[in-house]
Curated annotation (Swiss-Prot):
Pathway: Glycan biosynthesis; glycogen biosynthesis. GO terms for molecular function: ATP binding; glucose-1-phosphate adenylyltransferase activity. It comes from the Bacteria. Its EC number is 2.7.7.27. It catalyses: alpha-D-glucose 1-phosphate + ATP + H(+) = ADP-alpha-D-glucose + diphosphate. Belongs to the bacterial/plant glucose-1-phosphate adenylyltransferase family. Alpha-D-glucose 1-phosphate binds at residues 107, 172, 187-188, 205. Involved in the biosynthesis of ADP-glucose, a building block required for the elongation reactions to produce glycogen. Catalyzes the reaction between ATP and alpha-D-glucose 1-phosphate (G1P) to produce pyrophosphate and ADP-Glc. InterPro entries: ADP-Glc_PPase, ADP_Glu_pyroP_CS, GlgC_bac, GlmU/GlgC-like_hexapep, NTP_transferase_dom, Nucleotide-diphossugar_trans, Trimer_LpxA-like_sf. This is Glucose-1-phosphate adenylyltransferase.
Length: 420
């Protein structure tokens, strides 16, 4: 247990971000990039939220473990997160899987992804490790979680939030006592246990953990020597500590950064095309629950140099117009109408098109007289003149990746296969 350290505890912590997952439920969006590198919110990547939370919380030592198709992610981190200065006792390390302790090319699990880099962590000598998943959308002050960890004398503190039971099978689910000490922890149960006072809800792990570094090292070395372990935090490390030590739950409501005092806490997994589309479209609300305009808690990212967005033509039937939409730098909207749409960097929309509730990634070009509704369009796609999506479900399903909720994911290979 920690003694003799005064707050803020973040200055004694290192954030370790697990960013190696593919995110296969995002389908073709992760064919060329890891899930943490997927674009979000007009100009950011998903990983920028965990990294920005760490930076805004006061953490100045950060490491990112990468694995699946890491080139896009590494390039983004090198360009957008290169401002840490060793002379100010700051560091930012990118840690690809690299056979550091064995002949295995890949990390064997989330715990192994930390274990293989113990020597790098040890060289910085942090008092605490804040272990983060790099693939969630939320704003959170990790200093408050660190404070609870120290105050309650925990071996591990687990970030958690309430989710509907029917959705809890994809999470670690816990049961806690009146002091939020974790009594049981089950990773991704087929039948998630309910909260005692809320039969339709479960208390789920956010994949955020706080450890004292020395204790974490001991646990990782013990786990690495266990041939029966899958070397995973949720499956192995956390249940072992619950049984043999003191594990405490930190409720997200205590540390979330809200868009305004009355707003609900906002955390999204964005692990499916439907969830990804919905979380982006959330940002088009007049007062969204996730505030990207908060100067006190900014989302840092790579600031690509682009010209301003431009809207041209102002004639009846040919007017460049965007309503309840986010339009990034370098975009040109030429005589077309957008509603509840996100345009990422460098998108070009030609005349007479109508676009509604669309998430359009960088450098897409939309031809003339297109009608696009409820779509996600991958980076660099060229949409041909006259394409209609969102009107005929059967035709959409034949041509594109159409989800249960009717969202169409469009990639360039899908466009190339069209018989137009």
């Amino acid at each position: 247990m920690t003694t003799g350290i005064e707050p803020p505890f973040a200055r004694h912590a290192m954030a370790y971000v697990l960013a190696g997952g593919r995110g296969s439920r995002l389908m073709e969006l992760t064919d060329r990039r890891a899930k943490p590198a997927v674009y979000f919110g007009g100009k950011s990547r998903i990983i920028d939220f965990a990294l920005s939370n760490a930076l805004n919380s006061g953490i100045r030592r950060i490491a990112v473990a990468t694995q699946y198709k890491a080139h896009s992610l590494i390039r983004h981190l090198q360009h957008g997160w290169n401002f840490f200065r060793p002379e100010r006792n700051e560091s930012f390390d990118i840690l690809p899987a690299s056979q550091r302790v064995s002949e295995e090319l890949w990390y064997l699990g989330t715990a192994d992804a930390v274990y293989q880099n113990l020597d790098i962590i040890e060289s910085y000598d942090p008092q605490f490790i804040v272990l983060l998943a790099g693939d969630h959308i939320y704003k959170m002050d990790y200093e408050k979680m660190l404070q609870q960890h120290v105050q309650q004398g925990a071996h591990v503190t687990v970030g958690c939030l309430e989710v509907p039971r029917k959705e809890a099978s994809g999470f670690g689910v816990m049961h806690v006592d009146a002091n939020d000490q974790i009594l049981s922890f089950i990773e991704k149960p087929a039948h998630p246990p309910a909260m005692p006072d809320k039969p339709d809800m479960a208390l789920a792990s956010m994949g955020i953990y706080v450890f004292e570094t020395k204790f974490l090292f001991e646990e990782l070395r013990r786990d690495a020597a266990d041939k029966n372990s899958s070397h995973d935090f949720g499956k192995d490390i956390i249940p072992h500590i619950v049984k043999h030590g003191k594990a405490v739950a930190h409720r997200f409501d205590r540390s979330c950064i809200r868009s305004h005092a009355e707003s609900a806490s906002y955390w999204r997994d964005v692990g499916t095309v439907d969830a990804y589309w919905a979380a982006n479209i959330d940002l088009t609300d007049i007062v969204p629950q996730l505030d990207l305009y908060d100067h006190n808690w900014p989302i840092w990212t790579y600031g690509e140099i682009t010209p301003p967005a431009k809207f041209v033509h102002d004639k009846v039937g040919r007017r460049g117009l965007a309503t309840s939409s986010l339009v990034s730098g370098g975009c040109i909207i030429s005589g077309s109408t957008l509603t509840q749409t996100l345009l990422f960097t460098g998108v070009r929309i030609h005349s007479f098109s109508t676009i509604e509730q669309a998430v359009i990634l960088p450098y897409v070009e939309v031809g003339r007289a297109c009608e696009l509704k409820n779509v996600v369009i991958d980076r660099g796609v060229r949409i041909p003149d006259g394409l209609v999506v969102g009107e005929d479900p059967e035709l959409d399903e034949q041509r594109f990746r159409r989800t249960e909720n009717g969202i169409c994911l469009i990639t360039q290979p899908m466009i190339d296969r069209l018989d137009l």
